Amino acid sequence: ASGGVGLRRAARAVQCGDAEIVACIAGDTNHVGSFRNTIASFSQFANDAVYPYGSGGPNGSFAFLTDHYMREFGARREDFAKLCIAQRDNALAFPHALMKRPLTLDAYMDARPIADPLCLFDCVMPCAGAEAYLVMAEDRAKSLNLDYARILSTIERHNAYPDDPIQIRGGWAMDVDGFYDLAGIGPEDIDFLQVYDDYPVICFMQIEDLGFCKKGEAAEFVRTHDLTVAGGDFPINTSGGQLSVGQAGAAGGSLGLVETIRQLTDANLGAVVQGARHGLAS
């Protein structure tokens, strides 16, 4: 589901001269049968320790992670709610979002439980969808009179921190310093953030691991920042993210990346981050 991996491969192909223009296309759908196959083989952990005992799918696993994060760092459901409500606010201006109505704190807090402490609005809505973009050299884009966004830096990490008994940090934390050094900017220069949002707790982890605050401080960070595009000092998931737009299977990882390109090339479909120069997508 990683849009960034495809971007890195395409950029390398262009840099090496193996291709002049690469079309990166992601499309997927969710059917009941295919979803059951997915949860049956979601990860090696799921294969060995979860699915055989009747707790299939990621909801249960991420519920454990969310519960641990809340107890370890003092995060509250109201903190996760603020993120979800802000993303829904952003989604109201995005024509392709599945969720068309505002989300209130009461509606979030009173939503039916899915896997404690996760409730309905902590989970993505499966859907069908697709995203696409072109990768080429800057001079080629100019010759074709195309608006473009420049890639300043990318990182890719798999199976990070395999010895952690509970994953409260991701691969971003291993490479974040080199990531910003290569880009020549820092977290303070980022105008908006698009994070992979399969669950709110993963957004919190990325806010921390990408250098916007220290580990365990994302809840306080969210409490003290406006995450909406309309009035926010820290716009996050400007299209609404997967929690409000929907998760088109493996194509979901390209949602934030394409939205980043739109924001930086004045090709917005929804809310506009005024004057944005630097965006970060995970």
Locations of regions flagged by a protein language model:
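Conserved catalytic cysteine-centered active-site region
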Residues: 1-25, 29-61, 99-125, 152-157, ...
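Short glycine/threonine-rich loop-to-helix capping motif typified by GTGT followed
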Residues: 163-167, 197-221, 232, 248-250
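Phosphate/pyrophosphate-binding loops at sites that engage ATP/ADP/AMP, CoA/4′-phosphopantetheine
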Residues: 69-74, 176-189, 268
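Short acidic, glycine/serine/threonine-rich loops at helix termini
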Residues: 33-38, 92-96, 163, 204-207, ...
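Active-site-proximal alpha-helical scaffold in enzymes
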Residues: 1-28, 59-93, 133-139, 248-268
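Beta-strand segments within the central parallel beta-sheet cores of soluble alpha/beta enzyme folds
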Residues: 22-27, 78-85, 146-156, 187-196, ...
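Stable alpha-helical structural segments in soluble proteins, enriched in small hydrophobic residues
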Residues: 2, 6, 10, 14, ...
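Condensing-enzyme catalytic core mediating Claisen C-C bond formation in acyl metabolism
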Residues: 48, 81-82, 113-178, 227-239, ...
